[in-house]
């Protein structure tokens, strides 16, 4: 499959998904991945059949762990070394100290898969992950890491995107492994989908084609409905924020609403994602260097729309409503201006302080609309501020909430999912920075505390009494450095796993 067919016959490039299996042995694998663990007596190999280890050591003329260390292997999480293995290859990957946790296993499996993919040399490989997984949960985590580690940015060339790895087999005899393996497959597929969307060039992925691709992703899912509001429907509905941001582009904006409503569900989770398919900054135009990666500014919408597909496929017993607020922020004669006053969906008037602070504007319309679904918990997620990146770096996302209960719920879900968040406050002093002399509120203010200021703005559009969390994923959503563990370059799909885990917690 070369791509996802969308409404205008454009194909969005996608990454092929490897097959996923569980087996008691690694027979037939081109590459075997095992662990290097730091035990009380020094490094040891974790996984691999004892007979195979014995035969290999007879060939090497030394203990396998010694051979690995001499070749550059290490127990450091994610480090890899490749050795010959019965005519094929063995990847030994560092797992840390004995008794390592789930996230260490996920990272190690991802690192092993990336190292295995580098051995393909144009052919698709069958890979076995034999890391001593003894429980069904460990099987799921190892499978997640390995599948996510297989991902590479889809190419747009005359040749197809053939996968370096065609099959991933988790070696384990754990009881109940197959259902957990299916969970891993569904979750990885959702992360792949979010990555595919983020990686797609903005001339291929714009509001109309993004919406069409979401419809394809959600097609034929039980208890799922998809509604797309185009420019005319947005005008009739009073979505002034989305229309203002998208007004400068030849590609008109969209609001995508996806609802998953399983019979018998008693709780509702609302998800709102920023979907700026390209952010030039508008009339407050970005520099060339800061504009190049701005196809990624729809990472929040990608996360919520991919996540709801996974939630439905998992059959979780919770009602979920996801909103993708889609627009392209471009400068033109029809674009909005600094100092414009925009009337939002809920009637709030907003003075535009900077056309490059557009994400909060589309999100505000989405939040106000989502509150009408009477959710028990509402989460918005966006690549919102450079200020959050300055504060927390490229691997940690910021979370700001309505209170301790919402923060604890979100952080528990993120920890279980293996995604790193850090809570920031919203202070009264920060809120004062939103004052406008001519409108109800101003969209932006001082640079200091910019992440908190944006969160304070968004909270104005959340109905009091609803638990709310704002996730600023500007740092970890897009990787401009080298690939590491299960994280590829470019789109990471960050946030998908946390949102799915949150839904699972709410489903009980």
Swiss-Prot record:
Q: Per UniProt, where does Mn(2+) 2 bind?
A: 274, 279, 297, 358
Q: Which SUPFAM superfamilies match?
A: Macro domain-like (SSF52949), Zn-dependent exopeptidases (SSF53187)
For this chain's record, the cofactor binding note is:
Binds 2 manganese ions per subunit.
Q: In the record, what terms sit under GO molecular function?
A: manganese ion binding; metalloaminopeptidase activity
Q: Which reaction does it catalyse?
A: Release of an N-terminal amino acid, Xaa-|-Yaa-, in which Xaa is preferably Leu, but may be other amino acids including Pro although not Arg or Lys, and Yaa may be Pro. Amino acid amides and methyl esters are also readily hydrolyzed, but rates on arylamides are exceedingly low; Release of an N-terminal amino acid, preferentially leucine, but not glutamic or aspartic acids
Q: Which cofactors does it use?
A: Mn(2+)
One GO cellular-component annotation of the UniProt record comes to: cytoplasm
State the superkingdom.
Bacteria
Q: Do you know which InterPro entries this protein is assigned to?
A: Leucine_aapep/pepB, Macro_dom-like, Peptidase_M17_C, Peptidase_M17_leu_NH2_pept, Peptidase_M17_N
**Can you tell me where the transmembrane regions are?**
none
Q: Where, if anywhere, are coiled coils annotated?
A: none
Its localization reads:
Cytoplasm
The annotated active site, in chain numbering, is 286, 360
- Residues that, per the record, bind Mn(2+) 1: 279, 356, 358
Enzyme Commission designation: 3.4.11.1, 3.4.11.10
Record's Pfam families? Peptidase_M17, Peptidase_M17_N
GO biological process: one example: proteolysis
Q: Which UniProt keywords apply?
A: Aminopeptidase, Cytoplasm, Hydrolase, Manganese, Metal-binding, Protease
This protein's major location comes to cytoplasm
Similarity section: Belongs to the peptidase M17 family.
Q: What does this protein do?
A: Presumably involved in the processing and regular turnover of intracellular proteins. Catalyzes the removal of unsubstituted N-terminal amino acids from various peptides.
The record's listing under PANTHER family reads: CYTOSOL AMINOPEPTIDASE, LEUCINE AMINOPEPTIDASE-RELATED
Q: What is this protein called?
A: Probable cytosol aminopeptidase
| Organism lineage | Bacteria, Bacillati, Actinomycetota, Actinomycetes, Propionibacteriales
The protein's gene is named: pepA
